[in-house]
Amino acid sequence: MAFKLASSPHLKVQLQTQSVMRRVILCALPGIAAQCYFFGFGVLIQVMLAIVVALTAEAAVLALRKRAVLSTISDNSALLTAILIGVAIPPIAPWWLVVIGTLFAIVLVKQLYGGLGQNIFNPAMAAYVMLLISFPVQMTSWSIPTAIAQNPMDIGLTLQAIFGSMSAEQLSLYKLGFDGVAMATPLDTVKTDLSLGLTTSESLTKAIFSDGYGVGWFWVNMAYLAGGLIMLKLKVIRWHISFAILGSLFVCSSFGYLLSPDTHVGPLLQLFSGATMIAAFFIATDPVTAATSVKGRLLFGTLIGVMVYVIRTYGGYPDAFAFAVLLANLCAPFIDYYVKPRTYGHRTGN
């Protein structure tokens, strides 16, 4: 058998930043589509608004810094940040919320540190935490899934809700489910019920849990999981961080559930509710703000998974990925310093 031998250098071509970002965005599309299907047109409107603000803000800052505008914007990093912010914002949140968050992410968290590759925090998660602390009411008013909403919103009503032409009384009616209760996320519902003295099993009897995991949230997480697996197949990301997050979260939640099933959420609900899959595959794997070595990435992911469980279970926020990712970003330089790969040719001393 004849083998064709190419001339040197025998180097593997590395993906350019633009190509990597494009592939990540394409792999996120199934999850975005699932969110739009279950939570309405507001998801798409928030994403589009975030994209416009992100690209405009990045172009303005680059022009002020006298940097190349078109070549920098075309790397798609601002586009990806905008998409992550858009899907993290409640679908019918007021328009100014996503504008403030996107400006904060692009101008302060990314460009103020020098641009792509220089920021120490994940811009989308930093913006999310800033908004959550500054505007807790707006950031925790998540839409009822259209399948159990008393009054599902069409695109016209969604635009009215986002851009402020709908009264507060009208808006409250569109946030009610079939049981007459306005809810946030499944995890938030359980956390609120536990604080009222109900057990986990009693909380799971509500309409939002009619499919066992939280209507819509299971399929949204499955869609992001599918996109994440495609990224692994395309070698856009490595498996260490994602699997460390999911594995540590599963182990911690299983242990807590076995000890006290009445006051703890089961592992499957932890994995397929909230932002678990999008955070594990699309957010925590950001190569700029994560650890770099194999052991470092495993430790980085495990740290996020454990912190998510602790904050979800004992903290004041039901979905803790943004806080966990930012805290892990702080620890990434420390992890890289102390967890270094063995140098090629290294020999242990006798």
From Swiss-Prot:
Taxonomy of the source species: Bacteria, Pseudomonadati, Pseudomonadota, Gammaproteobacteria, Alteromonadales
Source organism of the structure: Shewanella pealeana (strain ATCC 700345 / ANG-SQ1)
Function description: Part of a membrane-bound complex that couples electron transfer with translocation of ions across the membrane.
Highest taxon listed in the record's lineage: Bacteria
EC number: 7.-.-.-
Any GO BP annotation: transmembrane transport
Keywords, comma-separated and alphabetical: Cell inner membrane, Cell membrane, Electron transport, Flavoprotein, FMN, Membrane, Phosphoprotein, Translocase, Transmembrane, Transmembrane helix, Transport
Identification of the protein by name: Ion-translocating oxidoreductase complex subunit D
Family of this protein: Belongs to the NqrB/RnfD family.
Gene name tied to this protein: rnfD
Stored Pfam families: NQR2_RnfD_RnfE
Record's GO cellular component terms: plasma membrane
